[in-house]
Amino acid sequence: MRERGLLIVFSGPSGVGKGTVRAKIFESENNFEYSVSMTTRKQRPGEVDGKDYYFRTRDEFEEMIRNGQMLEYAEYVGNYYGTPLTYVNQTLDEGKDVFLEIEVQGALQVKEKVPDGVFVFLTPPDLEELRGRLVGRGTDSAEVIASRLEKAKEEIRLMSEYDYAVVNDKVELAAERVKKIIEAEHYRVDRVIERYVHMIDDVKV
């Protein structure tokens, strides 16, 4: 019996380094699939449907919402973005671990539907470090940075909704911590007990 994969939900405040840590995790040999999001925004030159995004019309996306086919979704700058439930379930059934990198509010939506997922919160060492990273991007005004820091405070308060908290003090260390969490989750008794119960039942004494 093939073991079903794990749904790994990875989130944290803006600027904490989610994408950088996730990329470092994917550098080593693994059984991970990065979840492909669905969007209603226009397809850009060079983008491949089903690889970069699943591109759908607004009507198609809203119909999927009504039919309960989205694991999570949000509207941003007039376009929908979300995670299709069928893709996630098919990939998990193939025995692969699905890595879902999303914002905190999206993660809470997922937890309602998939409570046995592995929820990992990436946090900065402190808010001053986070401020430095946001300033270092050089893309946001002082007002935007202040707004992001206030939102970060709200998100950090929701850390208790997660299974694990990982400090991103160094990218390499943070990536190793997340990999160890995932490895340990595969050996939890509630995930493997059926396999071993069948083994005992099959033995004739």
UniProtKB/Swiss-Prot annotation:
Primary role: Essential for recycling GMP and indirectly, cGMP.
Q: What is this protein called?
A: Guanylate kinase
Query: Where is this chain's protein located in or outside the cell?
Result: Cytoplasm
Q: Which GO terms describe its cellular component?
A: cytosol
The enzyme class is transferase
Pfam families per the UniProt record, alphabetical: Guanylate_kin (PF00625)
State if Transferase is listed as a keyword: yes
Reactions catalysed, as given in the entry = GMP + ATP = GDP + ADP
**Which species expresses this protein natively?**
Lactococcus lactis subsp. lactis (strain IL1403) (Streptococcus lactis)
Q: Residue limits of the Guanylate kinase-like domain?
A: 5-183
Superkingdom of this protein's organism? Bacteria
Q: Which family does it belong to?
A: Belongs to the guanylate kinase family.
Q: Please name the taxonomic classification of the source.
A: Bacteria, Bacillati, Bacillota, Bacilli, Lactobacillales
Give the signal peptide range. none
Which amino acids does the record list as binding ATP?
12-19
